[in-house]
Swiss-Prot record:
It catalyses: (2E)-4-hydroxy-3-methylbut-2-enyl diphosphate + oxidized [flavodoxin] + H2O + 2 H(+) = 2-C-methyl-D-erythritol 2,4-cyclic diphosphate + reduced [flavodoxin]. Pathway: Isoprenoid biosynthesis; isopentenyl diphosphate biosynthesis via DXP pathway; isopentenyl diphosphate from 1-deoxy-D-xylulose 5-phosphate: step 5/6. Its cofactor is [4Fe-4S] cluster. This is 4-hydroxy-3-methylbut-2-en-1-yl diphosphate synthase (flavodoxin). GO terms for biological process: isopentenyl diphosphate biosynthetic process, methylerythritol 4-phosphate pathway; terpenoid biosynthetic process. Belongs to the IspG family. [4Fe-4S] cluster binds at residues 270, 273, 305, 312.
Length: 372
């Protein structure tokens, strides 16, 4: 198998968003946000359930009005994944969704109202054991910080975040996480680095407004990858102008690439050349779609010829190495069989599903033995 990442994660305190642990070594949680009208309960519930199916640990929902808060109550009753309510300006909305079982409040203490209103929200969160996310964004910095720094800078984002952190500290509230997002990769990365040195609360990572499905995924992979490789980050969202389901897929792909957290199949495939003995690209594309339901962590290498194929297969759960008319199939580094190149997709799908079932059963037995 491929080596696990030698990443030493930053030490942080732990909070819980619903039943999902955040920080203190817990698995890095992958989040997304709905883009439906929250008042359209059916559409929002359907989107949240779609996110659940692809592995979302947490889902954020914008709650801009009291009507949306009433809709949130109905939404919460119909889904299982923990929900974060995204709230700005009106403290009463925060109090209302707290009544309806929200799992986390995303607010900026600076725009939620005066000191008394902030205290009311924090006291309510404390009483109901609801964590808060302080969300600082380069696009909405306080006016005095814009004037002081002239433009968003890492120091400006840090100062904004620390204002809000200090505010919660004065109210003796410790159950919170912090984000300092920007659309510029280097601005976001340096802001998180500075913040990580200042506080020990969990950090929520993101490159905000990253872009469309392709460009946004690239920017997020670079920015989040840099931070995660340094051990910074306890939860993340990949922000894309695309179907939110894609955010979850890209988020897990980033974690899989860094060997931090695996969910489903990690496909290793060659870019192809004239040496390929079967349709590698078509095979990989078809299998990625067919096997989206597999959540068992496993490496599958699909290489079109014998130049690199055997080497990759040696360190893969399953590996295929292209050959004339038939290709070699490896399991756990050992050559087991040959597959007909003309029926590669169906054969390989069946082998992968069988291997996933075998691994799941082995893990189930291991858990039972530990429990005994």
């Amino acid at each position: 198998m491929h080596n696990q990442a030698p990443i030493q994660r930053r030490k942080s305190t732990r909070i819980y968003v619903g039943n999902v642990p955040i920080g203190d070594g817990a698995p890095i949680a992958v989040q997304s946000m709905t883009n439906t009208r929250t008042t359209d309960v059916e559409a929002t519930v359907n989107q949240i359930k779609a996110l659940e199916r692809v592995g979302a640990d947490i889902v954020r929902v914008s709650v801009p009005t009291m009507d949306a808060a009433e809709a949130f109550k109905l939404i919460k009753q119909q889904v299982n994944v923990p929900l974060v309510a995204d709230i700005h300006f009106d403290y009463r909305i925060a109090l209302k969704v707290a009544e309806y079982g929200v799992d986390c409040l995303r607010i900026n203490p600076g725009n939620i109202g005066n000191e008394e209103r902030i205290r009311m929200v924090v006291d309510c969160a404390r009483d109901k054991n609801i964590p808060i996310r302080i969300g600082v964004n380069a696009g909405s910095l306080e006016k005095d910080l814009q004037e002081k720094y002239g433009e968003p800078t890492p120091q400006a984002l840090l100062e904004s975040a620390m204002r809000h952190v200090d505010h919660l500290d004065r109210l003796n509230f410790e159950q919170f996480k912090v984000s300092v997002k920007a659309s510029d990769v280097f601005l976001a990365v340096e802001s998180y680095r500075l913040l990580a040195k200042q506080i020990d609360q969990p950090l929520h990572l993101g490159i905000t407004e990253a872009g469309g499905a392709r460009s946004g995924a690239v920017k997020s992979a670079i920015g989040l990858g840099l931070l995660l490789s340094e051990g910074i980050g306890d939860t993340l969202r990949v922000s894309l102008a695309a179907d939110p389901v894609e955010e979850i897929k890209v988020g897990f792909d980033i974690l899989k690439s860094l060997r931090i957290r695996s969910r489903g199949i990690n496909f290793i495939a060659c870019p192809t050349c004239s040496r390929q003995e079967f349709d590698v690209i078509g095979t990989v594309n078809a299998l990625e779609q067919r096997l989206e339901d597999i959540i068992t962590p496993m490496d599958v290498s699909i290489i079109g010829c014998v130049v690199n194929g055997p080497g990759e297969a040696l360190v893969s759960t399953l590996g295929v190495t292209g050959g004339n008319k038939k290709s070699g199939l490896y399991e756990d580094g050992v050559r087991k069989d040959r597959l007909d190149n003309n029926d590669m997709i169906d054969q390989l799908e069946a082998r992968i599903r069988a291997k996933a079932s075998q691994l799941d059963e082995a893990r189930r037995i291991d858990v039972q033995q530990v429990e005994k």
